[in-house]
C-alpha cells in the first residue's frame, strides 16, 4: 500500500488539493503498477509561520520578497 505524504503551506483551494491528490495517485499507479484502490495520499497544510526554510519562516521569506 503506497502512502504519499505532502506538506504544504495553507492557501490552496479544495479543487487544487483534489487535483494534486488525483495526479499523485495516477503517477504512482502508472509508475509502479500499484492498484489504484491501495494508494493513499495524505496532504497536510500548515501555516506559513510554521514552515521553515533555512531557519526562516515562509511568511518572512514571502514578506521580504524572497519567496
Where are the regions that the model predicts?
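A domain-level signal for the structural core that forms small-molecule/cofactor-binding pockets
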Residues: 1-67
